[in-house]
Structures are given as structure tokens and as C-alpha cells.
Amino acid sequence: MKNIRVTVEYDGTSFAGWQRQSGAIVTVQGEIEVALGKILQEKISLAAAGRTDKGVHARAQTANFFTASSLEPSRIVHSLNSLLPQTIRISNPEEVDADFHARHSAKERQYRYFLIEEPSAIYGRFAGCSFGKLDVAIMQQMAAILVGTHDFSAFSKEDRDNPGRICSVTACKWYPCKHYLVLRISADRFLRSMVRYLVDAMIRAGKGRLSVGDFCRMLETGVTTSQLNPALPAGLFLWDVLY
């Protein structure tokens, strides 16, 4: 059996997330596995670095799968891209060691969130919207507070009783990029919807609706003291994965 690693780029707008689901629900993983099954004539199960939510995109998701096929990885990917919708592209195929796992072998994941201040028919497809001016200095202050190891219980959709809610954030910063304000955040791992909850908290602070003190208390106690909602998925990209 060969272990094949690939990079997956996708526009998540029309997908119900990465993870395969039963029935007729269309997901990125499901589309790729069906196409691989046709090419390789065997049942394929993909592992991925991150299970992105409905509507979330990826610039460089990493995935791997095992196959008994003798086809070269480059031929597999060429055939794969001919079968997949244009909203999914596969690149950088390579055979890797049998113990490589896209999720478990990852050392760091980087996400970026693209934000605009007013709705836009052009720029809004791949962005969240704050619907008003923001105090970026306050948002930058909050981003800096996130660097380090914390319990992110207050910023996740996951069951509060589940263990393993500690994440180590290595970098977090807002920066301007053309029409967007972009959050770049890197960590060893992320909880479900964690980035989108953090973005919503920072937007609220940037509009004067959440204090830095309340934000810090949520981070320290793991208890949400403000009614947070995950920011729109359209602005979020899984940007890179380091091994």
C-alpha cells in the first residue's frame, strides 16, 4: 500500500464542510473520495489536517490516503482534477512514509480571516463583514493577548465537558490587505469554530460592544460572559499546515 499526500484548495461556499456525511449532503471530502474511487477502483478514505465547517475555504489543506494502485501520484491527481468540480483543486502529490497522517503529524496550522467593513457584491464572497468602522487598535490588542497556551472553552462549539480544549497560539495579528482587514492566526490545533468565535469577539470589541477585560475573563475562565456568535464562514481560510 502506498501513502499519498496531497494539497487541497477549495472554495467552500457550496459545500457542507470538509467532513464526509451520509446521504446526499455534498462535502469536500465526499467529492474527492468518490472521484478517487472511480479512478483507483477501490474504496478510499481521506485523512485531513483540518475539518473545516460549512462555507469555510482552504488555500492549502493537507490530506493523505492509502492505495494499492500502481498509478503514479501525478497521474492520480491529473485524473482527479478532471473529475472534480472547479471549486476543488488538488496539487503537490507525493508518496510519503506509511506513518504520515495529515492530522496527527501536523505541528502547526494557520488560518486567515478576511474582513470588510461594509457589504460588497464583489469582495464579499470571500469575506466576513463588520457592518461599520472598527477600532483596529483594540482588536490588535486582543489578538496579542491570544498568543500563548490557553483554554479556549469560551470560544468553541464543542461540548464544554470534553477534555483537550487547550491550544497553543504561536502568532495572531490583524493586518490590512487591499480591500480587507485580515487576521492571521497560527496554533498547534484549533477547536471547532474557534477562529470564527474569536473574530466575532474582536469585531464586538472593535465596535465598543465588548471590553478587553471581559475578553480576558472569558479566556481565563473558559466561560462566555457575552453572547458570541461565530463570524460568517465566508471569510475564513485554512491557509497553511506545517509538518
From Swiss-Prot:
Under Gene Ontology molecular function, one entry of this record is: RNA binding
Q: Which UniProt keywords apply?
A: Isomerase, tRNA processing
Any S-S bridges, and between which cysteines? none
> Which residues hold substrate?
Y111
Q: Which Pfam families match?
A: PseudoU_synth_1
GO annotation terms (biological process): tRNA pseudouridine synthesis
- Give a yes or no for keyword Chloroplast in this entry: no
| EC numbers on record | 5.4.99.12
Name the catalysed reactions.
Answer: uridine(38/39/40) in tRNA = pseudouridine(38/39/40) in tRNA
Q: Which residues form the active site?
A: D53
Oligomeric form and interacting partners: Homodimer.
* Similarity annotation: Belongs to the tRNA pseudouridine synthase TruA family.
Q: What does this protein do?
A: Formation of pseudouridine at positions 38, 39 and 40 in the anticodon stem and loop of transfer RNAs.
- Name of this chain's protein: tRNA pseudouridine synthase A
* Native species: Pelodictyon phaeoclathratiforme (strain DSM 5477 / BU-1)
